């Protein structure tokens, strides 16, 4: 049993890494070309709509994907109930937002948002037809199939976006990119899952899941507000170009930290839920995931902080130079975001969606207070305050999970701090070794090679178990 779970977890991490890795590589490549063709204003306009699309998506899914994963043996009726509930809720939300579109355009002083938002909001309605299938794939840990589906959706949507941008469609190219991505994603989910909805509609299972899922719904909405509150505020109070520069920085930060968060998050909840009755084993597995997360996250995000200026100048050129300091600041908090993902999955796997909800309510209240206090001081000060708050709030999560799961702070510190300090020392050493280089192409290449070499050597010298296990797994060719 233990060996079976270990093997399943290892394979899940492998395909999760393949999924996240291919996703981020494609996003980076297509993102570079799109950023060269489009302006900060184009990204700013789409960025304003993000919070509305995501909140509507939260309402539409209503936390039932996680609820399905948490059920030991979900039935066809469970999936069917979730399917029809999601479709009906998303249709209602789309109608409401369709008529609210002129109000959104007026609030942000951007008349183009009326027609644009009505089109972009189609994405969450289309998405509702694949929520149950997504829950099925996650429950059955179909990580290989999830990787393939995401890959095809990314290729299709980005090619469409790139062609439209090349033909002068401006922000409409980003809108079409979003809609096509969701459409292809759903087609792939239907192709790989054997389950199909039927017209025997029974909302009984939804009612049973509601107590658990409603807390996730509230929390997901709060998470969305938390992650996008700065874009919303910037869109209201600052020029659209400033919003675009922040959106670009936030996108690159998210692309990087999502690689780690999605790699681990894809398997964390199903694995932890499967052993929730064995508290000691659950904590042992969680701490191993935590070490793996820290092992990847800190060097990746601190490394991006180090090379962000060269990266932006080389890839998307000088018109985006104003996004560099914002990206450098965001990457510091971005290093901790995958740890948030793990903490959240532990709370959900314990069936404590209330902990998940209240931790995030407190977080968004704190962020709103920061926004009210700091928005008068400019974008950079707001981003610094946001970063510090995100790091500090992790202590609140730790305190709650100590009570819920027995997760001790000293154990977490023992798992995280060595990787954080090694990554920070690596980047400081790399900076001083390479600071005399003037050519930005050479500087980017050398910094990447030097930092990777130093970090790898430190891990080998310290005989870090996570590294040895990763090497052994790759050698087995699985």
Describe the predicted segments one by one:
Residues 27, 58-76, 138-139, 249, ...:
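Helix-loop junctions and terminal segments of transmembrane helices
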Residues 12-27, 174-177, 181, 185, ...:
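Transmembrane helical elements of multi-pass membrane transporters/channels
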Residues 1-28, 66-69, 73-84, 113, ...:
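N-terminal membrane topogenesis motif
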């Amino acid at each position: 049993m233990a060996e079976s779970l270990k093997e399943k977890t290892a394979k899940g991490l492998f395909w999760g890494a393949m999924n996240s890795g291919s996703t981020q590589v494609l996003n980076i490549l297509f993102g570079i070309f799109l950023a060269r063709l489009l302006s900060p204003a184009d990204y700013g306009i789409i960025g304003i709509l993000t919070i509305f699309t995501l909140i509507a998506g939260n309402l539409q899914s209503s936390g039932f994907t996680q609820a399905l994963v948490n059920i030991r043996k979900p039935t066809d009726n469970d999936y069917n109930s979730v399917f029809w509930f999601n479709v009906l809720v998303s249709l209602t939300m789309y109608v409401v937002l369709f008529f609210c579109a002129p109000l959104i355009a007026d609030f942000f002083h951007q008349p183009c948002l009326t027609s644009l938002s009505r089109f972009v909001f189609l994405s969450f309605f289309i998405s509702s037809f694949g929520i149950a299938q997504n829950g099925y794939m996650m429950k059955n840990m179909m990580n290989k199939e999830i990787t393939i589906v995401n890959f095809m959706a990314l290729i299709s949507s980005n090619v469409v976006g790139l062609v439209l941008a090349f033909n002068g469609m401006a922000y409409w190219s980003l809108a079409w990119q979003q809609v096509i991505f969701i459409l292809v994603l759903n087609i792939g989910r239907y192709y790989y899952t054997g389950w199909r909805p039927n017209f025997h509609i029974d909302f009984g299972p939804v009612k049973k899941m509601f107590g658990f899922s409603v807390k996730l719904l509230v929390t997901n909405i709060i998470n969305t507000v938390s992650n996008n509150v700065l874009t919303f505020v910037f869109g209201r109070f600052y020029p659209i170009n400033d919003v675009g520069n922040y959106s670009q920085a936030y996108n690159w930060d998210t692309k990087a930290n999502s690689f780690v968060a999605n790699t681990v998050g894809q398997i964390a909840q199903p694995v932890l839920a499967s052993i929730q009755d064995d508290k000691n084993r659950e904590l042992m597995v969680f701490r191993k995931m935590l070490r793996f997360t820290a092992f990847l996250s800190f060097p990746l995000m601190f490394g991006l902080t180090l090379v962000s200026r060269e990266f932006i100048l080389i890839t998307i050129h000088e018109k985006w130079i104003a996004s560099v300091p914002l990206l450098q600041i965001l990457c510091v908090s971005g290093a901790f975001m995958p740890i948030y993902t793990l903490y959240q999955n532990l709370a959900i796997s314990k069936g404590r969606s209330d902990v998940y909800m209240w931790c995030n309510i407190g977080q968004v209240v704190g962020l709103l207070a920061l926004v009210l206090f700091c928005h008068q001081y400019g974008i950079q000060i707001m981003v610094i305050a946001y970063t510090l708050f995100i790091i500090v709030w992790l202590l609140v999560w730790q305190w709650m999970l100590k009570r819920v799961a027995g997760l001790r702070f000293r154990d977490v510190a023992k798992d995280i701090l060595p990787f954080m300090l090694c990554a920070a020392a690596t980047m400081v050493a790399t900076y001083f070794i390479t600071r005399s280089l003037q050519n930005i192409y050479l500087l980017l290449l050398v910094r990447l090679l030097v930092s990777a070499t130093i970090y790898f050597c430190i891990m080998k010298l310290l005989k870090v178990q996570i590294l040895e296990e990763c090497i052994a797994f790759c050698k087995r060719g699985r």
